[in-house]
Curated annotation (Swiss-Prot):
Possibly has a role in RNA transcription or processing during stress. It comes from the Eukaryota. Disulfide bonds: none annotated. Residues 80-149 are annotated as: Disordered. Keywords: RNA-binding. Residues 8-83 form the RRM domain. It comes from Arabidopsis thaliana (Mouse-ear cress). Induction: Up-regulated by cold stress, dehydration and salt stress. This is Probable glycine-rich RNA-binding protein 1. The lineage of its organism: Eukaryota, Viridiplantae, Streptophyta, Embryophyta, Tracheophyta. Belongs to the GR-RBP family.
Length: 149
């Protein structure tokens, strides 16, 4: 598939491991021409991580797909569709993943997508425990959750 000069890419998450490229293209082509659909594979297991990026020819097609598909069921799972890079107030979604720093927790920017790894989170601030749910800090640590305490 050819790539668009401007990329109109959206993140599609919550996918079943069995969801293949044909299912995605069949579903998303309804809203406009799909240039590319990139599935993210776990290096250790060789299985889908349950999300992919879909690139459209134009912005209107991408926006329509996001509006219509976000929260809909595909292959037995409710999926998430959002513009690539649209995160909460703290910043963008990191890399090819649902994680990454998204600002302070108390401002709604904390990412609960897990800690570390490819696309994993490291959000929050040190007062809140920082480094994501699956990483350093949090409950049971020294008061304040800082690595310095």
């Amino acid at each position: 598939m050819a790539y668009a000069d401007n990329e109109y890419r959206c993140f599609v998450g919550g996918l079943a491991w069995a969801t293949d490229e044909q299912s995605i293209e069949r579903c998303f082509n309804e809203f406009g021409e799909v240039f590319d659909s990139k599935i993210i594979i776990d290096r250790e297991t060789g299985r889908s991580k349950g999300f992919r990026f879909v690139t459209f020819k134009d912005e209107d097609s991408m926006r329509t797909a996001i509006d219509r598909m976000n929260g809909q069921e595909l292959d037995g799972r409710n999926i998430t569709a959002q513009a690539r890079g649209s995160g909460t107030r703290g910043g963008m979604v990191g890399g090819y993943g649902s994680g990454g720093y998204r600002g302070r927790r108390d401002q709604g920017g904390y990412n609960r997508g897990g800690g570390g790894g490819y696309g994993g989170g490291y959000g929050g601030d040190r007062r809140e425990g920082g480094y994501g749910d699956g990483g350093y800090g949090g409950q049971g640590r020294s008061e304040g959750g800082s690595w310095r305490n």
